[in-house]
């Protein structure tokens, strides 16, 4: 196989032996891939800072002589470092959550071009100091779940299809197992998530219809933002089959009001 040159986002790096790293990255054309970066721990000059988590890089890799082994990473050049994200622990945790989500969900060598573009766009927006980080996170989660075919049903009861507009006020049960909201007339949830208000659900629906520019113009209550975020993060964890480590860290930051 000839060498492949492509843009990628670093999803994970783990130590291998005394000097090497196994680097997992996400590309537009080939999806998630892993490669062996030889001597990456021994010499900083070998790859510089171009193997850091969620960096956008230009990489060159090719299969070695050993059949069935990992491809060898020969070059990694930094394209976008996202420095403003790295100077903010909360933003760093959010970017880490997105990387961990894609690492856990994506299949090897299965192209996901729209998700790749979503990740790049979300990192660029998060790197912008003027943009609300929580809105960027909510939009990422909404778009990711949609592209993964897992969009939550928020406009009507998943059992009787009664429109949200006819529910009145009060708490709303979100059922992870059924993938949407359940009206009071249909009973309890099988796998309940956070309890939401009608207003919080409507704000999520409004956000889902627009882009970041439109979201920036919306005046959203803090409580509704928090409830909507908690819903999407818990729904994501339900479908991943586990709570991502970076999400646990994020929750700890929030508990400490960081």
UniProtKB/Swiss-Prot annotation:
GO BP, sorted A to Z: DNA recombination; double-strand break repair
Keyword vocabulary terms for this entry: DNA damage, DNA recombination, DNA repair
InterPro entries assigned: ARFGAP/RecO, DNA_rep/recomb_RecO_N, NA-bd_OB-fold, RecO, RecO_C
GO CC annotations, alphabetized: bacterial nucleoid
Disulphide-bonded residues: none
One Pfam family in the UniProt entry: RecO_N
PANTHER family hit by this protein: DNA REPAIR PROTEIN RECO
HAMAP family in UniProt: RecO (MF_00201)
Role noted for this protein: Involved in DNA repair and RecF pathway recombination.
Protein family membership: Belongs to the RecO family.
NCBIfam families found in the cross-reference section: reco
Protein name: DNA repair protein RecO
Native organism: Desulfatibacillum aliphaticivorans
Native organism taxonomy: Bacteria, Pseudomonadati, Thermodesulfobacteriota, Desulfobacteria, Desulfobacterales
């Amino acid at each position: 196989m000839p060498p492949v040159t492509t843009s990628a986002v670093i999803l994970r790096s783990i130590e291998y032996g005394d000097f090497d790293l196994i680097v997992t990255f996400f590309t537009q054309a080939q999806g998630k891939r892993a490669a062996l970066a030889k001597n990456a721990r021994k010499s900083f000059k070998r790859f510089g800072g171009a193997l850091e988590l969620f960096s956008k890089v230009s990489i060159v890799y090719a299969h070695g002589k050993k059949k069935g082994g990992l491809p060898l990473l020969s070059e990694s050049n930094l394209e976008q470092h996202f420095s403003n994200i790295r100077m903010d622990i909360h933003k760093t945790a959010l970017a880490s959550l997105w990387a961990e989500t894609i690492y856990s969900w994506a299949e090897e060598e299965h192209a996901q071009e729209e998700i790749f573009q979503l990740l790049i766009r979300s990192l660029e927006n998060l790197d912008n100091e003027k943009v609300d980080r929580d809105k960027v996170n909510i939009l990422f989660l909404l778009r990711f779940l949609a592209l993964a075919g897992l969009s939550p049903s928020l406009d009507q009861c998943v059992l009787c299809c009664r429109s949200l507009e006819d529910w009145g006020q009060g708490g709303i049960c979100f059922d992870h197992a059924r993938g949407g909201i359940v009206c009071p007339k249909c009973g309890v949830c099988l796998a309940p998530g956070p309890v939401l208000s009608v207003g919080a659900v409507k704000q999520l629906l409004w956000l889902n219809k627009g882009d970041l520019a439109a979201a920036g113009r919306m005046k959203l209550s803090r409580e509704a933002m928090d409830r909507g975020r908690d819903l999407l993060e818990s729904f994501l964890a339900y479908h991943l089959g586990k709570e991502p480590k970076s999400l646990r860290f994020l929750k700890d930051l929030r508990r400490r009001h960081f």
